């Protein structure tokens, strides 16, 4: 409901040389005597890069491997990890957009949330009146910047009586480059109301 308070818990599930797995639990904020209502869970993978060279950094070399003290592999997160989104040859170009100032983050890259908004905008409001977004996966492949043109390819990969699943690929053209480069792959699973 509007104005309900909620809490996001987060923890590092695992760490590898260049990546960490971080889990999330979203639940209602309650008094200490009440059981918190769980609204959902999330999983993410993060990479550490040198902000000047844009190259990966060995996480275990930072502060003598301090990250190991923050790993909690015992805390449950009952959703499946993301899988690699596989696009078939049937993906159709459904939209092309230009990118502007409001699409970028402080580093000058297209903001992660903007990619998600643009993907969700591929489905009209009437679709959302009859379908609930049950699962959303996104993988960032390359960076894009203000002025790049983004192309959205959509493919329905599964349809059952109560479920529809779509794979989405986003490519870019730079200002002076006609070649398309893949920047994002995503999967959206909807449940019919």
Per-region residue spans from a language model:
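HotDog/MaoC-like acyl-thioester-processing domains
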Residues: 1-80, 140-149, 155-193
């Amino acid at each position: 409901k509007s104005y309900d308070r909620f809490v996001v818990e987060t923890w590092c599930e695992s760490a590898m040389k260049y990546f960490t797995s971080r889990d999330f639990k979203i639940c209602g904020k309650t008094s200490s005597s009440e059981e918190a209502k769980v609204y959902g869970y999330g999983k993410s993978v993060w990479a550490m890069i040198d902000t000047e060279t844009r190259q990966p950094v060995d996480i275990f070399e930072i502060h003598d491997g301090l990250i190991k003290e923050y790993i909690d592999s015992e805390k449950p997160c009952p959703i499946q990890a993301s899988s690699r989104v596989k696009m078939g040859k049937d993906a159709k170009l459904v939209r092309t957009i230009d990118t502007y100032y409001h699409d970028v983050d402080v580093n000058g890259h297209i903001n992660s949330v903007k990619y998600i908004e643009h993907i969700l905008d591929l489905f009209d409001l009437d679709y959302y009146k009859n379908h609930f977004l049950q699962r959303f996966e996104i993988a960032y492949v390359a960076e894009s910047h203000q002025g790049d043109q983004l192309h959205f390819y959509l493919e329905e990969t599964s349809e059952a009586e109560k479920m529809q699943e779509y794979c989405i690929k986003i490519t870019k053209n730079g200002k002076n480059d006609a070649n398309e480069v893949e920047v994002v792959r995503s999967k959206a699973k909807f449940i019919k109301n």
